[in-house]
């Protein structure tokens, strides 16, 4: 199952870059595992849960529209609620002033 979280942000700079470089990310149970490998498209990153939550969140920043597209991917019938909860908790705690809207869609 895949869930898409669309975050509309204001302000300058990449929200994806701010998330990946935030030293407090692990306090929310999230670990950045990959970002911008050579040969891959620019502006993407991946985070996993540091807790028992299964799955990963792929982050892609669209600078012109100020939109962060987050694809939550789980395997083997695991539900995404725990990792989504940790991620939304992190966004609202650390980047609330930049966030204009958060949309969550199931695919």
Q: Model-derived features: where do they sit?
A:
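Terminal, regulation- and interaction-focused segments at domain boundaries
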Residues: 1-28
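A conserved amphipathic terminal alpha-helix motif
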Residues: 78-107
């Amino acid at each position: 199952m895949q869930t898409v979280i669309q975050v509309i942000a204001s302000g300058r700079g990449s929200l994806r870059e701010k998330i990946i470089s935030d030293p407090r990310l692990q306090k929310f149970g999230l670990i950045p595992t990959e970002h911008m490998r050579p040969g891959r498209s620019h502006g993407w990153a991946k985070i996993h849960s540091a807790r028992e939550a299964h799955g990963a969140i792929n982050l892609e920043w669209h600078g012109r529209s100020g939109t962060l597209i987050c694809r939550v991917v789980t395997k083997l019938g695991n539900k995404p609620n725990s990792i989504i909860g940790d991620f939304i908790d992190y966004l609202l705690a650390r980047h609330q002033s930049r966030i204009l809207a958060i949309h969550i869609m199931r695919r």
